[in-house]
A protein has these predicted regions:
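A conserved beta-strand element that flanks and buttresses the S-adenosyl-L-methionine
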Residues: 115
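Conserved beta-strand signature within the Rossmann-like core of class I S-adenosyl-L-methionine
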Residues: 138-147
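Short catalytic micro-motifs in class I SAM-dependent methyltransferases
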Residues: 118-119
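Class I SAM-dependent methyltransferase SAM/SAH-binding core
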Residues: 44, 49-103
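Conserved helix-to-beta-strand junction in the class I
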Residues: 36, 132-137
Length: 174
């Protein structure tokens, strides 16, 4: 069984408790990223989980410049929770799709901005996932990685630019 399938199963069973455990940690990443790259136009939230980014954007009145907001996640249970947030914060602009960041079901260059928080640490093929995120974006791709991962330094040595850090994560963009 692939790493992705194992992770998917884990999120399927832990979806209900995710927000309680990770909301503050995720909001810290969003604060850092959104200072520089607020959402606009067509937005992809790749690995949206329970929709915490939608909640953050809605609470901070940052959805007005968004024409369409696409939530993609590999876990059906996480998407079910995200659906409630989508209805609350952007009912007419939100689309939820079950999918994998290593094989995105979109044409090239269709999104103005792509966010992918707490996802790349979990994929089977990091390079393929980043290539897919870049492929579907005509603008920036904002991502996070755990600080302690060995490939984090290699990515930051390339064309990736550092946005900031939290106690656990590095937030960067291309």
């Amino acid at each position: 069984m692939s790493k992705g399938h194992i992770i998917r199963e884990r999120y399927e069973t832990t979806a209900k408790g995710y927000d309680e455990l990770y909301r503050a940690e995720q909001f810290e990443k969003y604060f850092i990223a959104l200072k520089r790259f607020p959402p606009h136009g067509r937005v992809l939230d790749a690995g949206c989980g329970t929709g915490l980014l939608i909640e953050y954007l809605g609470l901070n009145k940052l959805l007005s410049g968004v024409d369409e907001y696409v939530c993609l996640d590999y876990s059906r249970n996480m998407l079910d929770i995200a659906k409630g947030r989508a209805r609350l914060y952007c009912p007419s602009k939100c689309l939820l799709i079950e999918g994998n960041v290593e094989d995105l079901p979109f044409r090239d260059n269709v999104f103005d901005l792509v966010y992918s928080f707490t996802v790349l640490d979990l994929v089977d093929d990091l390079e393929k996932a980043i290539m897919e995120l870049s492929r579907v974006s005509r603008g920036r791709v904002i991502m996070s990685l755990l600080k302690n991962l060995k490939y984090k330094d290699l990515l930051l040595e390339k064309e990736y630019k550092l946005l900031g850090t939290t106690s656990k994560d590095v937030i960067f963009y291309i």
